[in-house]
Amino acid sequence: MPAKKTMAQRLGQALETMTRQCGQLPETPAYGSWLLGRVSESPSRRWVRIKRIVTVYIMTANLTGIVVALLVVTFAFPVPSIYTDAPWWVTFGVAPAYATLALAIGTYWITTRIVRASIRWAIEERAPSQADGRNTLLLPFRVAAVHLILWDIGGALLATLYGLANRVFVTIILFSVTICGVLVATNCYLFTEFALRPVAAKALEAGRPPRRFAPGIMGRTMTVWSLGSGVPVTGIATTALYVLLVHNLTETQLASAVLILSITTLIFGFLVMWILAWLTAAPVRVVRAALKRVEQGDLRGDLVVFDGTELGELQRGFNAMVNGLRERERVRDLFGRHVGREVAAAAERERPQLGGEDRHAAVVFVDIVGSTQLVDNQPAAHVVKLLNRFFAIVVNEVDRHHGLINKFAGDAALAIFGAPNRLDRPEDAALAAARAIADRLANEMPEVQAGIGVAAGQIVAGNVGAKQRFEYTVVGKPVNQAARLCELAKSHPARLLASSDTLHAASETERAHWSLGETVTLRGYHQPTQLASPHRRPPGSIHLTAEHAEEIRTDRLG
């Protein structure tokens, strides 16, 4: 039976679902919350979004603070009463008028003047200067400072007016208004920092913030705790001290005052710390989601750095790591293209060393017929395009049959089967690849004739060269024999020849595609070699897979 969720877990799940900041949700927005929009959003629309978020939260936080202050003055300190022991024009005239005026003017001034002036560079799509970045990062502090000033002015004004009727009101009003003002300012500071993430991200692109403007996670946490919990608790202690000195509350009234202040402190303190934890967790969750994508092989895109604390450094570090991985993959891809995927993989597994090893392998040598005439009679660009089409067919079939293109030499290519990766029957792979190459060349590039030679046997495969520069290559009789067979195949009707020894070592299935022919003595050899060639197919009988047909269509359209 599953455990029953606590109230905190339910509230946390509700907030995470609403803001889409939970790491278990299907995707994590770039700024940590869908409320902040997308990275691609236009500056004008982003400004409207920020203005609405800041306005709504400032209004909500201040109205809540006003209600709480009224409840504290009314129920926590019932004696003297602001309704019966003070002038009515203060309670029902000046206090509501100042609250309304301060809320309207303060909200307008903060959103239209302070916020807009600090992020004007972002609205105008200008690169931020150092001063712009400083003003943007200081904006949450300025918003909180404006709230403290307005609440302190209101507290001083009301304390003075109420104090004319009873001096006890001075302490009560100053205490209640100051405590609520601090809590409201703290909440507005945190939420303004949240709303400004998209603009802060742009500011942080210009460089790391000065340390004095980014107190770090520890500094931010302790500041929020001090303002959200430390100050209210101090207020409770002040209340007790006030009662001890003034003696104007009964035990029941004192208990009620402490209870109300404690509940207020718990609620506001919990809310402030919850928002702080929520904002702190967002960058971590964004990084965690990005790490999951990297784990799955997705290296596209960088994180948006929107936090000025150590979490922003974490985001920068992640971006640096991904950039390094992308560069590594790019170098790996280039290395694999130059030396072959198998050779590159072997070099990654172990440190390359000069030397070689005996291997049983098969070799395929492919060379274009009449390449000199082709180069002399065609423009260079056309020749290069033709060679690329030719080698694309060769590489495709060699890869498909688990071979390795060891090198390109002008208009010729040398392919190895069985090195560096071992194959159970390298002869089968080499013969099948050679047949496929011959078939595709005849069907896809009839204007190009090429000779193909196949031989198998013992070779020496390894790194040859010097310590400063070496390459993986193969040497041995099969290599030379394949080259001689390739020369001979240029004048053979099938354009493809293999040695009988290679054919005998192949499987019965592969041998069924070949026929033994005449015996010749290859140039440079004393022993005769019996030739083998594939069965001749009637014109138009060449079988093409859907993949090859699509490649032909693409080449012709291109």
UniProtKB/Swiss-Prot annotation:
It comes from the Bacteria. It is found in: Cell membrane. Residues 362-486 form the Guanylate cyclase domain. Signal peptide: none annotated. Keywords: Cell membrane, Membrane, Transmembrane, Transmembrane helix. Its main location: membrane. Residues 545-558 have a biased composition (Basic and acidic residues). GO terms for cellular component: plasma membrane. The chain crosses the membrane at residues 63-83, 90-110, 143-163, 168-188, 226-246, 258-278. Gene3D superfamilies: 6.10.340.10, Nucleotide cyclase. This is Uncharacterized protein MT1361. It comes from Mycobacterium tuberculosis (strain CDC 1551 / Oshkosh).
